[in-house]
């Protein structure tokens, strides 16, 4: 399953990548993106992945700004420390909403759904 991570915290990327490797070894990490601008640029020249893990607060703004520029058609699992965006997340292809710190069980359950 071709997957990308949109996250600006290196420790969170390492944690999520490690968990995904343990829980779902068939996941193919395509890229890691750390900003709204970088994500928009990447999608302009690459095919849609099969799954996205996306943090909401990125260094250059809210990840929801991405949806104003790109029509994302694959499932999204949001990963954030903030619970107040859950309703908004489910309006943009979200299949799950994981609160940080993310553990193995969180990832297992998100991928089962």
Roles of regions detected by a PLM:
Residues 49-113:
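CheY-like receiver
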Residues 7:
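Conserved acidic carboxylate
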Residues 10-34, 69:
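Two-component/phosphorelay signaling modules centered on CheY-like receiver
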Residues 31-37, 60, 99:
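Short loop/edge segments at beta-strand edges and connector loops
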Residues 1-2:
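Non-catalytic signal-transmission and effector/linker regions of two-component phosphorelay proteins
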Residues 13, 40-41, 61:
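Conserved protein kinase catalytic core
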Residues 17, 32-51:
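Acidic, metal-coordinating helix/loop segments flanking the phosphotransfer/catalytic sites
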